[in-house]
Amino acid sequence: LTNPNKLANTFTSNGMGNISDKTISSYIDYLMDSFLISRAERYDVKGKKYISSPYKYYFTDIGLRNARLNFRQQEETHIMENIIYNELLIRGFNVDVGIVEHVQTDSDGKRRQKKYEIDFVCNRGNQRYYIQSAFSMPDQEKAEQEQRSLIYTNDFFKKIIVVKDNIVPWHNELGILIIGLKDFLLKNNSLEL
């Protein structure tokens, strides 16, 4: 998530100059206007409203991003998430980042409200999908972490976890579709499996 004010503070604290948050916002707008990046807004799933800031930005062309960085910083998890985002846009979805609040009781017996992120809330007409990008789910703990925000939506829209592994698509005991990235990208009906 990107917050121009935090970026400005980072530039200042790292001795990289005094750049205002308004300047950073302008540059982000220039990048969006030139179609180099696009913005996903934050959406409160239970409250059914948009949260004004911070936004999440994705590169429209991963190759240009990689070339600009001289093919360094190859964070596969972020690149995979970016590819999924771009594919959803190509398929005609409006794509937001979902926020789900859930009250939990901690070890002290106190109830605390926690926020969980859903990577993508995808809407097209009357269709809605919740999608998590999970580079891998090597164990039950990671699987529970990835599906937690999906479960806390407490609704009946389709829930999907996309993993990098080349797997046969399957539904877990909670009805969540687990699908490999390759099948997700190559099968036009991959969201309907």
Language model features with spans:
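Loop/helix-junction capping segments adjacent to catalytic residues or to phosphate/diphosphate-binding pockets
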Residues: L1, N18, Q140-E141
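A cross-kingdom feature that marks ATP-driven nucleic-acid transaction machinery
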Residues: K22-L193
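Short, positively charged loop/turn segments that connect secondary-structure elements
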Residues: T12-T23
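Short acidic, hydrophobic short linear motifs in intrinsically disordered regions
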Residues: L1-F11
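A short, structure-level motif marking secondary-structure boundaries and short turns
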Residues: F11-N14, R68-N70
